Protein backbone atom coordinates (compact mmCIF):
# COMPACT_ATOMS: atom_id res chain seq x y z
CA UNK A 1 0.00 0.00 0.00
CA UNK A 2 2.80 2.31 0.89
CA UNK A 3 4.56 1.59 -2.39
CA UNK A 4 1.52 2.72 -4.35
CA UNK A 5 1.34 5.96 -2.43
CA UNK A 6 5.02 6.63 -2.89
CA UNK A 7 5.13 6.28 -6.64
CA UNK A 8 7.35 8.52 -8.74
CA UNK A 9 5.81 11.61 -10.25
CA UNK A 10 6.68 12.90 -13.68
CA UNK A 11 7.14 16.40 -12.26
CA UNK A 12 10.44 15.41 -10.63
CA UNK A 13 9.21 15.48 -7.00
CA UNK A 14 8.02 12.74 -4.60
CA UNK A 15 5.70 13.30 -1.63
CA UNK A 16 6.60 11.04 1.30
CA UNK A 17 3.54 10.40 3.52
CA UNK A 18 5.60 9.06 6.41
CA UNK A 19 7.71 12.20 6.90
CA UNK A 20 5.23 14.61 5.20
CA UNK A 21 7.98 16.09 3.06
CA UNK A 22 8.45 16.72 -0.63
CA UNK A 23 11.61 15.02 -1.93
CA UNK A 24 13.30 15.64 -5.25
CA UNK A 25 13.67 12.87 -7.76
CA UNK A 26 17.45 12.66 -8.22
CA UNK A 27 17.81 10.45 -11.25
CA UNK A 28 20.49 7.86 -11.88
CA UNK A 29 23.67 7.39 -9.86
CA UNK A 30 25.85 8.58 -12.73
CA UNK A 31 23.94 11.88 -12.95
CA UNK A 32 24.35 12.37 -9.20
CA UNK A 33 28.05 11.63 -9.45
CA UNK A 34 28.43 14.24 -12.18
CA UNK A 35 26.73 16.81 -9.96
CA UNK A 36 28.96 15.88 -7.03
CA UNK A 37 32.05 16.24 -9.22
CA UNK A 38 30.81 19.59 -10.53
CA UNK A 39 30.39 20.93 -6.98
CA UNK A 40 33.69 19.35 -5.89
CA UNK A 41 35.52 21.14 -8.73
CA UNK A 42 34.50 24.52 -7.28
CA UNK A 43 34.46 23.58 -3.58
CA UNK A 44 37.31 21.04 -3.19
CA UNK A 45 37.52 21.11 0.61
CA UNK A 46 34.07 19.63 1.25
CA UNK A 47 33.25 15.94 1.70
CA UNK A 48 30.91 13.97 -0.54
CA UNK A 49 28.39 13.56 2.28
CA UNK A 50 28.11 17.32 2.85
CA UNK A 51 27.81 17.99 -0.89
CA UNK A 52 25.06 15.36 -1.25
CA UNK A 53 23.07 16.73 1.70
CA UNK A 54 23.23 20.30 0.40
CA UNK A 55 22.31 19.11 -3.11
CA UNK A 56 19.30 17.30 -1.65
CA UNK A 57 18.27 20.45 0.19
CA UNK A 58 18.40 22.53 -3.01
CA UNK A 59 16.62 19.89 -5.16
CA UNK A 60 19.88 18.74 -6.81
CA UNK A 61 20.61 22.21 -8.16
CA UNK A 62 24.35 22.60 -8.63
CA UNK A 63 24.31 26.40 -8.88
CA UNK A 64 22.39 26.89 -5.63
CA UNK A 65 24.61 24.35 -3.88
CA UNK A 66 27.80 26.10 -4.97
CA UNK A 67 26.33 29.47 -4.00
CA UNK A 68 25.41 28.09 -0.55
CA UNK A 69 28.95 26.79 -0.01
CA UNK A 70 30.48 30.08 -1.16
CA UNK A 71 28.19 32.24 1.01
CA UNK A 72 28.46 29.98 4.07
CA UNK A 73 24.75 29.13 4.31
CA UNK A 74 25.51 25.45 3.68
CA UNK A 75 26.47 25.00 7.35
CA UNK A 76 22.91 25.87 8.41
CA UNK A 77 21.53 23.33 5.93
CA UNK A 78 23.85 20.64 7.33
CA UNK A 79 22.76 21.51 10.89
CA UNK A 80 19.11 21.04 9.84
CA UNK A 81 19.91 17.58 8.42
CA UNK A 82 21.75 16.59 11.62
CA UNK A 83 19.01 17.79 14.01
CA UNK A 84 16.29 16.04 12.01
CA UNK A 85 18.18 12.76 12.09
CA UNK A 86 18.66 12.91 15.87
CA UNK A 87 14.96 13.56 16.54
CA UNK A 88 13.88 10.66 14.35
CA UNK A 89 16.33 8.30 16.09
CA UNK A 90 14.80 9.11 19.50
CA UNK A 91 11.26 8.41 18.29
CA UNK A 92 12.13 5.14 16.52
CA UNK A 93 14.02 3.39 19.33
CA UNK A 94 11.21 1.00 20.30
CA UNK A 95 9.61 0.62 16.88
CA UNK A 96 10.22 -2.55 14.82
CA UNK A 97 12.54 -2.00 11.92
CA UNK A 98 11.03 -2.03 8.41
CA UNK A 99 11.95 -4.57 5.78
CA UNK A 100 14.34 -2.31 3.90
CA UNK A 101 16.54 -1.40 6.92
CA UNK A 102 18.55 -4.57 7.66
CA UNK A 103 21.43 -3.46 5.48
CA UNK A 104 21.29 -0.01 7.14
CA UNK A 105 21.04 -1.44 10.67
CA UNK A 106 24.10 -3.64 10.28
CA UNK A 107 27.33 -2.12 11.75
CA UNK A 108 29.66 -0.08 9.61
CA UNK A 109 31.94 -3.07 9.19
CA UNK A 110 29.25 -5.04 7.35
CA UNK A 111 28.61 -2.00 5.19
CA UNK A 112 32.23 -1.94 4.22
CA UNK A 113 32.18 -5.66 3.44
CA UNK A 114 29.06 -5.44 1.28
CA UNK A 115 30.11 -2.33 -0.63
CA UNK A 116 31.75 -4.37 -3.40
CA UNK A 117 28.65 -6.55 -3.80
CA UNK A 118 26.45 -3.50 -4.08
CA UNK A 119 28.70 -1.95 -6.69
CA UNK A 120 28.57 -5.10 -8.81
CA UNK A 121 24.76 -5.20 -8.66
CA UNK A 122 22.82 -4.19 -11.81
CA UNK A 123 22.14 -0.56 -12.46
CA UNK A 124 18.39 -1.23 -12.09
CA UNK A 125 18.88 -1.68 -8.34
CA UNK A 126 20.45 1.79 -8.13
CA UNK A 127 17.60 3.45 -9.97
CA UNK A 128 15.32 3.87 -6.94
CA UNK A 129 14.34 7.08 -5.22
CA UNK A 130 17.11 9.70 -5.62
CA UNK A 131 19.69 6.94 -6.22
CA UNK A 132 20.72 6.85 -2.54
CA UNK A 133 19.29 3.55 -1.27
CA UNK A 134 21.21 0.28 -1.02
CA UNK A 135 18.74 -2.57 -1.34
CA UNK A 136 17.08 -1.42 -4.53
CA UNK A 137 13.88 0.29 -3.26
CA UNK A 138 12.77 2.53 -0.36
CA UNK A 139 9.48 1.99 1.48
CA UNK A 140 7.28 4.70 2.89
CA UNK A 141 8.08 3.53 6.41
CA UNK A 142 11.69 4.76 6.06
CA UNK A 143 12.33 8.19 7.52
CA UNK A 144 14.81 10.94 6.81
CA UNK A 145 17.22 9.06 9.08
CA UNK A 146 17.35 6.07 6.73
CA UNK A 147 17.72 8.45 3.81
CA UNK A 148 20.74 10.09 5.46
CA UNK A 149 22.24 6.64 6.05
CA UNK A 150 21.72 5.86 2.38
CA UNK A 151 23.45 9.12 1.51
CA UNK A 152 26.41 8.11 3.68
CA UNK A 153 26.58 4.80 1.81
CA UNK A 154 26.50 6.68 -1.49
CA UNK A 155 29.33 8.93 -0.31
CA UNK A 156 31.35 5.83 0.57
CA UNK A 157 30.68 4.45 -2.93
CA UNK A 158 31.78 7.71 -4.52
CA UNK A 159 34.95 7.75 -2.46
CA UNK A 160 35.72 4.22 -3.54
CA UNK A 161 35.21 5.11 -7.19
CA UNK A 162 37.51 8.13 -6.80
CA UNK A 163 40.20 6.52 -4.66
CA UNK A 164 40.05 2.71 -4.68
CA UNK A 165 43.31 2.30 -2.77
CA UNK A 166 42.23 4.45 0.19
CA UNK A 167 38.84 2.73 0.22
CA UNK A 168 40.49 -0.69 0.33
CA UNK A 169 42.71 0.37 3.24
CA UNK A 170 39.68 1.70 5.14
CA UNK A 171 37.86 -1.55 4.47
CA UNK A 172 40.78 -3.56 5.83
CA UNK A 173 40.93 -1.41 8.97
CA UNK A 174 37.20 -1.79 9.57
CA UNK A 175 37.34 -5.54 8.99
CA UNK A 176 40.27 -5.87 11.40
CA UNK A 177 38.36 -4.00 14.11
CA UNK A 178 35.32 -6.21 13.45
CA UNK A 179 37.43 -9.36 13.87
CA UNK A 180 38.89 -8.02 17.13
CA UNK A 181 35.46 -7.20 18.57
CA UNK A 182 34.27 -10.71 17.82
CA UNK A 183 33.07 -12.48 14.73
CA UNK A 184 30.56 -14.63 16.59
CA UNK A 185 28.46 -11.66 17.76
CA UNK A 186 28.39 -10.31 14.24
CA UNK A 187 27.23 -13.63 12.79
CA UNK A 188 24.57 -13.94 15.51
CA UNK A 189 23.23 -10.50 14.65
CA UNK A 190 23.13 -11.36 10.97
CA UNK A 191 21.23 -14.60 11.68
CA UNK A 192 18.75 -12.69 13.88
CA UNK A 193 18.12 -10.16 11.16
CA UNK A 194 17.69 -13.05 8.74
CA UNK A 195 15.00 -14.67 10.90
CA UNK A 196 13.06 -11.40 11.42
CA UNK A 197 12.94 -10.14 7.84
CA UNK A 198 11.78 -12.91 5.54
CA UNK A 199 11.58 -10.63 2.53
CA UNK A 200 15.37 -10.20 2.58
CA UNK A 201 16.05 -13.92 3.13
CA UNK A 202 17.86 -14.76 -0.14
CA UNK A 203 20.04 -11.67 -0.04
CA UNK A 204 20.94 -12.03 3.66
CA UNK A 205 21.66 -15.73 3.22
CA UNK A 206 24.02 -15.00 0.38
CA UNK A 207 25.72 -12.32 2.48
CA UNK A 208 26.04 -14.63 5.51
CA UNK A 209 27.60 -17.32 3.31
CA UNK A 210 30.00 -14.98 1.59
CA UNK A 211 30.91 -13.06 4.75
CA UNK A 212 33.36 -15.59 6.32
CA UNK A 213 35.15 -16.00 2.99
CA UNK A 214 35.42 -12.23 2.62
CA UNK A 215 36.68 -11.89 6.20
CA UNK A 216 39.36 -14.52 5.68
CA UNK A 217 40.38 -12.86 2.42
CA UNK A 218 40.63 -9.49 4.12
CA UNK A 219 42.60 -11.00 7.02
CA UNK A 220 45.02 -12.58 4.55
CA UNK A 221 45.31 -9.27 2.74
CA UNK A 222 45.99 -7.59 6.09
CA UNK A 223 48.82 -10.08 6.72
CA UNK A 224 50.22 -9.35 3.27
CA UNK A 225 50.02 -5.59 3.89
CA UNK A 226 52.61 -5.78 6.72
CA UNK A 227 55.62 -5.81 4.34
CA UNK A 228 53.69 -3.40 2.13
CA UNK A 229 53.51 -0.92 5.03
CA UNK A 230 57.23 -1.39 5.63
CA UNK A 231 57.96 -0.73 1.98
CA UNK A 232 55.71 2.34 2.11
CA UNK A 233 57.67 3.56 5.14
CA UNK A 234 60.93 3.01 3.31
CA UNK A 235 59.53 4.72 0.24
CA UNK A 236 58.45 7.68 2.38
CA UNK A 237 61.99 7.91 3.74
CA UNK A 238 63.50 7.85 0.27
CA UNK A 239 60.89 10.40 -0.84
CA UNK A 240 62.15 12.76 1.87
CA UNK A 241 65.70 12.21 0.65
CA UNK A 242 64.58 12.87 -2.93
CA UNK A 243 62.91 16.10 -1.83
CA UNK A 244 66.07 17.18 0.00
CA UNK A 245 68.13 16.33 -3.07
CA UNK A 246 65.76 18.33 -5.26
CA UNK A 247 66.01 21.33 -2.95
CA UNK A 248 69.81 21.07 -2.95
CA UNK A 249 69.84 20.85 -6.75
CA UNK A 250 67.65 23.95 -7.04
CA UNK A 251 69.89 25.76 -4.56
CA UNK A 252 72.94 24.77 -6.62
CA UNK A 253 71.41 26.43 -9.66
CA UNK A 254 70.65 29.48 -7.54
CA UNK A 255 74.22 29.56 -6.21
CA UNK A 256 75.49 29.32 -9.78
CA UNK A 257 73.50 32.43 -10.59
CA UNK A 258 74.85 34.10 -7.42
CA UNK A 259 78.43 33.29 -8.47
CA UNK A 260 77.82 34.82 -11.89
CA UNK A 261 76.33 37.92 -10.29
CA UNK A 262 79.26 38.22 -7.88
CA UNK A 263 81.71 37.84 -10.76
CA UNK A 264 79.97 40.55 -12.74
CA UNK A 265 79.91 42.84 -9.71
CA UNK A 266 83.61 42.21 -9.02
CA UNK A 267 84.58 42.89 -12.64
CA UNK A 268 82.54 46.05 -12.58
CA UNK A 269 84.21 47.12 -9.34
CA UNK A 270 87.65 46.34 -10.78
CA UNK A 271 87.01 48.39 -13.88
CA UNK A 272 85.72 51.18 -11.71
CA UNK A 273 88.84 51.07 -9.51
CA UNK A 274 91.22 51.20 -12.46
CA UNK A 275 89.14 53.92 -14.05
CA UNK A 276 89.51 55.90 -10.85
CA UNK A 277 93.24 55.22 -10.89
CA UNK A 278 93.48 56.35 -14.47
CA UNK A 279 91.55 59.49 -13.72
CA UNK A 280 93.77 60.09 -10.69
CA UNK A 281 96.89 59.65 -12.82
CA UNK A 282 95.55 61.96 -15.43
CA UNK A 283 94.73 64.55 -12.78
CA UNK A 284 98.19 64.19 -11.33
CA UNK A 285 99.70 64.56 -14.75
CA UNK A 286 97.73 67.70 -15.39
CA UNK A 287 98.71 69.06 -11.99
CA UNK A 288 102.37 68.32 -12.63
CA UNK A 289 102.21 69.93 -16.03
CA UNK A 290 100.64 73.02 -14.54
CA UNK A 291 103.27 73.12 -11.85
CA UNK A 292 105.96 72.78 -14.45
CA UNK A 293 104.52 75.79 -16.23
CA UNK A 294 104.66 77.73 -12.99
CA UNK A 295 108.25 76.65 -12.38
CA UNK A 296 109.19 77.69 -15.86
CA UNK A 297 107.59 81.07 -15.41
CA UNK A 298 109.31 81.65 -12.10
CA UNK A 299 112.69 80.58 -13.46
CA UNK A 300 112.32 82.76 -16.50
CA UNK A 301 111.35 85.68 -14.30
CA UNK A 302 114.42 85.18 -12.11
CA UNK A 303 116.68 84.89 -15.11
CA UNK A 304 115.09 87.94 -16.64
CA UNK A 305 115.77 89.96 -13.51
CA UNK A 306 119.35 88.76 -13.55
CA UNK A 307 119.61 89.73 -17.18
CA UNK A 308 118.36 93.20 -16.47
CA UNK A 309 120.81 93.60 -13.61
CA UNK A 310 123.66 92.47 -15.81
CA UNK A 311 122.66 95.02 -18.47
CA UNK A 312 122.54 97.76 -15.82
CA UNK A 313 126.00 96.94 -14.57
CA UNK A 314 127.29 96.93 -18.15
CA UNK A 315 125.92 100.44 -18.75
CA UNK A 316 127.59 101.65 -15.59
CA UNK A 317 130.90 100.28 -16.82
CA UNK A 318 130.55 102.44 -19.94
CA UNK A 319 130.37 105.59 -17.82
CA UNK A 320 133.09 104.47 -15.44
CA UNK A 321 135.47 107.13 -16.94
CA UNK A 322 133.28 109.85 -15.56
CA UNK A 323 132.90 108.27 -12.10
CA UNK A 324 134.85 109.07 -9.03
CA UNK A 325 137.12 106.69 -7.26
CA UNK A 326 134.53 105.79 -4.68
CA UNK A 327 131.88 105.12 -7.32
CA UNK A 328 134.28 102.86 -9.15
CA UNK A 329 134.92 100.86 -6.00
CA UNK A 330 131.17 100.43 -5.59
CA UNK A 331 130.80 99.36 -9.22
CA UNK A 332 133.55 96.81 -8.94
CA UNK A 333 131.93 95.39 -5.79
CA UNK A 334 128.51 95.13 -7.49
CA UNK A 335 129.99 93.34 -10.49
CA UNK A 336 131.90 90.98 -8.22
CA UNK A 337 128.72 90.18 -6.26
CA UNK A 338 126.77 89.61 -9.47
CA UNK A 339 129.37 87.27 -10.80
CA UNK A 340 129.59 85.41 -7.49
CA UNK A 341 125.87 84.56 -7.78
CA UNK A 342 126.43 82.78 -11.07
CA UNK A 343 126.23 79.39 -9.32
CA UNK A 344 122.63 80.12 -8.38
CA UNK A 345 121.85 80.61 -11.98
CA UNK A 346 123.19 77.15 -12.67
CA UNK A 347 121.19 75.67 -9.79
CA UNK A 348 118.11 77.39 -11.07
CA UNK A 349 118.44 75.66 -14.40
CA UNK A 350 118.90 72.23 -12.76
CA UNK A 351 115.97 72.54 -10.37
CA UNK A 352 113.47 73.14 -13.13
CA UNK A 353 112.88 69.46 -14.07
CA UNK A 354 110.48 66.52 -13.26
CA UNK A 355 111.58 63.69 -10.91
CA UNK A 356 109.61 60.60 -9.75
CA UNK A 357 110.08 57.10 -8.26
CA UNK A 358 108.59 54.93 -10.97
CA UNK A 359 109.79 51.58 -9.54
CA UNK A 360 108.06 52.08 -6.21
CA UNK A 361 104.91 53.07 -7.98
CA UNK A 362 105.13 49.96 -10.17
CA UNK A 363 105.52 47.73 -7.11
CA UNK A 364 102.54 49.30 -5.43
CA UNK A 365 100.53 48.90 -8.63
CA UNK A 366 101.54 45.24 -8.88
CA UNK A 367 100.30 44.62 -5.34
CA UNK A 368 97.20 46.70 -5.91
CA UNK A 369 93.94 44.73 -5.56
CA UNK A 370 93.24 41.17 -4.31
CA UNK A 371 91.04 38.37 -5.65
CA UNK A 372 89.73 35.70 -3.22
CA UNK A 373 89.63 32.16 -4.62
CA UNK A 374 86.88 29.67 -3.63
CA UNK A 375 87.77 27.11 -0.98
CA UNK A 376 86.96 23.48 -1.80
CA UNK A 377 85.81 22.29 1.63
CA UNK A 378 83.79 19.37 0.24
CA UNK A 379 84.69 15.82 1.24
CA UNK A 380 83.69 12.29 0.24
CA UNK A 381 81.54 10.38 2.73
CA UNK A 382 83.01 7.19 4.16
CA UNK A 383 80.88 4.11 3.56
CA UNK A 384 78.82 2.80 6.47
CA UNK A 385 79.62 -0.50 8.15
CA UNK A 386 76.13 -1.75 7.33
CA UNK A 387 76.85 -1.51 3.61
CA UNK A 388 80.08 -3.44 4.14
CA UNK A 389 78.30 -6.15 6.09
CA UNK A 390 75.63 -6.44 3.40
CA UNK A 391 78.29 -6.79 0.73
CA UNK A 392 80.08 -9.45 2.78
CA UNK A 393 76.85 -11.36 3.31
CA UNK A 394 76.45 -11.94 -0.44
CA UNK A 395 76.45 -15.58 -1.64
CA UNK A 396 79.84 -15.32 -3.34
CA UNK A 397 81.53 -14.02 -0.18
CA UNK A 398 79.80 -16.64 1.92
CA UNK A 399 81.08 -19.40 -0.35
CA UNK A 400 84.56 -17.89 -0.24
CA UNK A 401 84.47 -17.79 3.56
CA UNK A 402 83.30 -21.39 3.74
CA UNK A 403 86.05 -22.51 1.38
CA UNK A 404 88.68 -20.67 3.44
CA UNK A 405 87.60 -22.50 6.63
CA UNK A 406 87.87 -25.95 5.06
CA UNK A 407 90.54 -28.36 6.21
CA UNK A 408 93.62 -29.09 4.15
CA UNK A 409 93.42 -32.12 1.86
CA UNK A 410 96.59 -33.94 3.04
CA UNK A 411 95.35 -34.18 6.64
CA UNK A 412 92.02 -35.57 5.47
CA UNK A 413 93.55 -38.21 3.28
CA UNK A 414 96.00 -39.29 5.96
CA UNK A 415 93.23 -39.56 8.55
CA UNK A 416 91.11 -41.59 6.19
CA UNK A 417 93.94 -43.98 5.33
CA UNK A 418 94.56 -44.79 8.99
CA UNK A 419 90.97 -45.86 9.58
CA UNK A 420 90.75 -48.28 6.63
CA UNK A 421 91.06 -52.03 7.08
CA UNK A 422 93.69 -54.00 5.13
CA UNK A 423 91.00 -55.53 2.93
CA UNK A 424 89.60 -52.24 1.75
CA UNK A 425 89.64 -51.71 -1.96
CA UNK A 426 91.53 -48.75 -3.40
CA UNK A 427 88.30 -47.51 -5.02
CA UNK A 428 86.92 -46.64 -1.58
CA UNK A 429 90.15 -44.82 -0.81
CA UNK A 430 89.79 -42.87 -4.01
CA UNK A 431 86.23 -42.13 -3.03
CA UNK A 432 87.28 -40.88 0.38
CA UNK A 433 89.89 -38.56 -1.10
CA UNK A 434 87.74 -37.50 -4.02
CA UNK A 435 86.81 -34.18 -2.43
CA UNK A 436 89.92 -32.61 -0.95
CA UNK A 437 88.39 -29.36 0.31
CA UNK A 438 85.41 -30.75 2.25
CA UNK A 439 85.68 -30.87 6.08
CA UNK A 440 85.72 -34.22 7.89
CA UNK A 441 82.33 -34.79 9.46
CA UNK A 442 82.51 -37.33 12.25
CA UNK A 443 79.21 -39.08 13.04
CA UNK A 444 78.87 -41.50 15.95
CA UNK A 445 76.70 -44.58 15.53
CA UNK A 446 74.72 -43.92 18.70
CA UNK A 447 73.87 -40.36 17.82
CA UNK A 448 72.60 -41.14 14.35
CA UNK A 449 68.89 -41.06 13.76
CA UNK A 450 66.98 -42.65 10.94
CA UNK A 451 66.08 -39.62 8.90
CA UNK A 452 67.17 -38.06 5.70
CA UNK A 453 70.33 -39.73 4.47
CA UNK A 454 70.49 -42.65 7.02
CA UNK A 455 68.52 -45.88 7.10
CA UNK A 456 69.33 -49.18 8.81
CA UNK A 457 70.67 -51.77 6.39
CA UNK A 458 72.25 -55.15 6.62
CA UNK A 459 75.25 -56.78 5.06
CA UNK A 460 73.98 -55.57 1.76
CA UNK A 461 76.16 -52.49 2.13
CA UNK A 462 79.22 -54.74 1.90
CA UNK A 463 78.04 -56.19 -1.37
CA UNK A 464 80.57 -55.77 -4.22
CA UNK A 465 77.83 -54.31 -6.40
CA UNK A 466 77.08 -51.77 -3.71
CA UNK A 467 80.77 -50.90 -3.45
CA UNK A 468 80.86 -50.45 -7.18
CA UNK A 469 77.96 -48.08 -6.92
CA UNK A 470 79.81 -46.12 -4.25
CA UNK A 471 82.92 -46.06 -6.43
CA UNK A 472 80.96 -44.79 -9.39
CA UNK A 473 79.40 -42.24 -7.09
CA UNK A 474 82.86 -41.07 -5.98
CA UNK A 475 83.96 -40.71 -9.58
CA UNK A 476 80.73 -38.91 -10.34
CA UNK A 477 81.32 -36.50 -7.51
CA UNK A 478 84.78 -35.75 -8.82
CA UNK A 479 83.27 -34.58 -12.10
CA UNK A 480 83.09 -30.89 -12.97
CA UNK A 481 79.29 -30.85 -13.03
CA UNK A 482 78.92 -31.93 -9.41
CA UNK A 483 81.63 -29.66 -8.04
CA UNK A 484 80.38 -26.59 -9.95
CA UNK A 485 76.93 -26.47 -8.31
CA UNK A 486 76.76 -24.54 -5.04
CA UNK A 487 73.36 -26.03 -4.18
CA UNK A 488 74.84 -29.54 -3.77
CA UNK A 489 77.62 -28.72 -1.30
CA UNK A 490 75.68 -30.13 1.66
CA UNK A 491 75.66 -33.65 0.20
CA UNK A 492 79.41 -33.98 -0.61
CA UNK A 493 80.38 -32.68 2.84
CA UNK A 494 79.35 -36.04 4.34
CA UNK A 495 81.51 -38.14 2.04
CA UNK A 496 84.62 -38.63 4.26
CA UNK A 497 82.62 -39.71 7.29
CA UNK A 498 80.56 -42.07 5.18
CA UNK A 499 83.61 -43.78 3.72
CA UNK A 500 85.10 -44.31 7.20
CA UNK A 501 81.93 -45.95 8.45
CA UNK A 502 81.68 -48.09 5.34
CA UNK A 503 85.27 -49.17 5.79
CA UNK A 504 84.60 -50.18 9.39
CA UNK A 505 81.55 -52.17 8.38
CA UNK A 506 83.45 -53.95 5.65
CA UNK A 507 86.33 -54.88 7.92
CA UNK A 508 83.90 -56.25 10.47
CA UNK A 509 82.30 -58.40 7.79
CA UNK A 510 85.61 -59.80 6.50
CA UNK A 511 86.90 -60.67 9.97
CA UNK A 512 83.88 -62.88 10.55
CA UNK A 513 82.54 -61.16 13.64
CA UNK A 514 78.97 -61.29 12.35
CA UNK A 515 76.62 -59.19 10.32
CA UNK A 516 76.88 -55.49 11.22
CA UNK A 517 73.51 -53.88 11.83
CA UNK A 518 75.12 -50.45 11.90
CA UNK A 519 73.26 -48.10 9.55
CA UNK A 520 75.19 -46.85 6.58
CA UNK A 521 74.25 -43.94 4.29
CA UNK A 522 72.32 -44.85 1.15
CA UNK A 523 73.46 -43.98 -2.30
CA UNK A 524 72.60 -40.35 -3.13
CA UNK A 525 70.50 -39.59 -6.15
CA UNK A 526 72.27 -38.58 -9.34
CA UNK A 527 69.86 -35.75 -10.02
CA UNK A 528 69.82 -33.55 -6.93
CA UNK A 529 72.16 -35.18 -4.41
CA UNK A 530 69.31 -36.49 -2.20
CA UNK A 531 69.35 -39.93 -0.55
CA UNK A 532 67.77 -42.75 -2.52
CA UNK A 533 65.16 -44.89 -0.80
CA UNK A 534 65.72 -48.63 -1.27
CA UNK A 535 62.92 -51.20 -1.50
CA UNK A 536 61.48 -52.58 1.74
CA UNK A 537 62.16 -56.16 0.60
CA UNK A 538 65.91 -55.57 0.84
CA UNK A 539 65.52 -54.38 4.44
CA UNK A 540 63.51 -57.44 5.49
CA UNK A 541 66.06 -59.76 3.85
CA UNK A 542 68.89 -58.01 5.68
CA UNK A 543 67.09 -58.42 9.04
CA UNK A 544 66.29 -62.07 8.40
CA UNK A 545 69.85 -62.87 7.39
From Swiss-Prot:
- Keyword Cytoplasm among UniProt keywords: yes
Name the segments for region: Disordered: 85-137, 197-216, 369-545
UniProt lists the gene as: SPATS2
> What is the official name of this protein in its record?
Spermatogenesis-associated serine-rich protein 2
Q: Which UniProt keywords apply?
A: Cytoplasm, Phosphoprotein
Biased composition annotated in UniProt, kind: Basic residues? 85-96
Q: What are the record's GO terms for cellular component?
A: cytoplasm; cytosol
Please tell me the species this chain comes from. Answer: Homo sapiens (Human)
A GO molecular-function annotation: RNA binding
Q: Does the UniProt entry include the keyword Protein transport?
A: no
Residue spans of biased composition, Low complexity class = 379-415, 475-490
Modified residues annotated as Phosphoserine in this record: 143, 146, 148, 520
State the organism's lineage. Answer: Eukaryota, Metazoa, Chordata, Craniata, Vertebrata
Compartment list:
Cytoplasm
Main localization (coarse): cytoplasm
Amino acid sequence: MSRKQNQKDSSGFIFDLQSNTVLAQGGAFENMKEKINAVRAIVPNKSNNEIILVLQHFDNCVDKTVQAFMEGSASEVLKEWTVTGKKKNKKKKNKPKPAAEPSNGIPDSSKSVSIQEEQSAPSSEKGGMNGYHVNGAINDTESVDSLSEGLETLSIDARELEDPESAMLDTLDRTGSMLQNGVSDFETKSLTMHSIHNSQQPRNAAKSLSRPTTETQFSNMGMEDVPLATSKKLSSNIEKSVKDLQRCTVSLARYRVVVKEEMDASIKKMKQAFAELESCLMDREVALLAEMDKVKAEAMEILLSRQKKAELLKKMTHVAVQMSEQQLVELRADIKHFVSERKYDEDLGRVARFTCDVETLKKSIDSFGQVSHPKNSYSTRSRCSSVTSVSLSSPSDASAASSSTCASPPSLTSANKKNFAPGETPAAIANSSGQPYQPLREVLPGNRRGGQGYRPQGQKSNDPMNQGRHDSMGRYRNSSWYSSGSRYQSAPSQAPGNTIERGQTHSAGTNGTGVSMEPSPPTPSFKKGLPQRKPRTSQTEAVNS
